[in-house]
Amino acid sequence: MRLSSAIVVFVALTCTVSAQWRYRDPTAPRTADGKVDVKAPPPRTASGTVDLSGIWQTDIKYNFNLGADLKPDDIVMLPGAQALYAERRDNDGKDDPEGFCLPPGFPRVNGVPFPQKIVQLAGTIVILYETRTTFRQIFFDSNHTLANDPQPTWMGYSKGRWEGDTLIVETTGFNDKTWLDDAGHPHSEQMKVTERFRRPSFGQLFVDITIDDPKVYAKPWTVTQAFQLMADGELIEYVCNENNLDVPHLVGK
């Protein structure tokens, strides 16, 4: 087992502190005792669209294995990808770029033990990630140059649209340097990730994530991640190079 995995477990136990730069949200609905009413209806924008804004965090298990909730035959790798996956596991994940303070990439960034902040604007949704101090932009303009002519990047380029109260986001333009999780699930530059965001209440967010990569997987596969609202808090700065104790202790071939 890599030391990095042990460190991640420790961080997972303390990650709520990392986001709790205490700040009372004056817009949040409250119960009689002053606590945030997480069961209240979701907020809406002036145009009536569900507002996804807030600080959110999902289960760290998705960093260890993005397919943690799936059956083994739900994820079918092609022979070359299967060989790469086995090599990474045999090598104890020593070559995982995330262990060298490189970006975790998307969608892996969701599962790392640090929160993310969704900022919903009129024509763009911005997602700020505490880890690596990185971000995503979701563009709603179908003619947006970045989204239509992407250059390969760690996080890809995202285009969004609303279908009722569900936000659908399609992300392409990835490089092939990232791993989907600590287990070493691979992907190629042809990967397309489709998300379906649903916020049924003030304190709940569900995101269906579909991985479609014909160079790596025999069929698309989908995982649903449940996010909890981290109310009355704020992101704080995280600098990986100041916290990275992994490299001198990495094991493997």
Q: What positions do the PLM features span?
A:
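Positively charged n-region of N-terminal signal peptides that target proteins for export
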Residues: 1-5
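PEST-like low-complexity, intrinsically disordered acidic/proline/serine-rich tracts
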Residues: 9-11, 15-253
